[in-house]
Amino acid sequence: MTVPAVGTQEAKRRTPFVGGALGVARAFPVTLALTTVIVIIGVLTGTVFRADHQSILDAVGFDLEALKSGRLWTVPAATLIQAQPGIKWHMVLLVLALGPLEYMAGSLWALLAFFLTDWVSSILTTLTLWALAGMGSGTAERLVHTPDMGSSAAALGALAAVATMLPGGLAAVALGGLLVFLGASFTWWELDVATAHLMAAGAGVALGWFLRWRRKAAT
């Protein structure tokens, strides 16, 4: 009887794992790439660059001054760097939202949803705060001049797109639950954060409806 070599047995045990990992990487390249980049940045800002985080926020974060001056080139970076140093909760939400969207709509649309919903949210939130500040809101006046950045709005935008693309009544239930959560979040999040999340979700719903129409038109 021939006894298989130990190395051969170990290689056979590793092969399904390696094959499975490669399969996941091929199926969800955008989700894995963005999550990896954001986590690495989070680790770096929480350790090596922790003392420089405020300077990074001032240079990259989006606020009224950035909008007025047309400093939009920093917006992509602002989507990837968090407003607080270190690892944050929405990094998990990103995987839970972006992964299903990439599966349902494809990698390109997942990438576009991630960035576009955040960019639309950044501009609309700043304009909303500016309008509220003009109406006498002291909170809005303070926040509209406070630089902000992060990927939580992008994650919620992707989640809203996924909810919109669900079949039948599931979409209505999911969107209703998301709307209740976002409305209630104004009681525990700052006005700018809650507004940004709501705006991103709105952009995600619009994108989700477009993708539903596109999918239906293709069948």
Predicted regions and their residues:
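N-terminal signal-anchor transmembrane alpha helix
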Residues: R13-L57
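Aromatic-enriched alpha-helical transmembrane segments of multi-pass intramembrane proteins
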Residues: L22-V37, G70-L72, D148, G168-W188
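Aromatic-anchored segments of alpha-helical transmembrane domains
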Residues: I38-L44, D118-L127, G177-D192
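N-terminal TM1-TM2 helical hairpin plus the immediately adjacent luminal interfacial "cap"
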Residues: T45-S107
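Hydrophobic, membrane-inserted alpha-helices
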Residues: T74, V92-G99, A153-A161, G176-F186
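Membrane-helix interface "capping/anchor" motifs
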Residues: E102-A110, A161-A174
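Membrane-interface micro-motifs in multi-pass membrane enzymes
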Residues: E141-V162, A196
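Loop-to-transmembrane alpha-helix initiation sites
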Residues: W189-V205
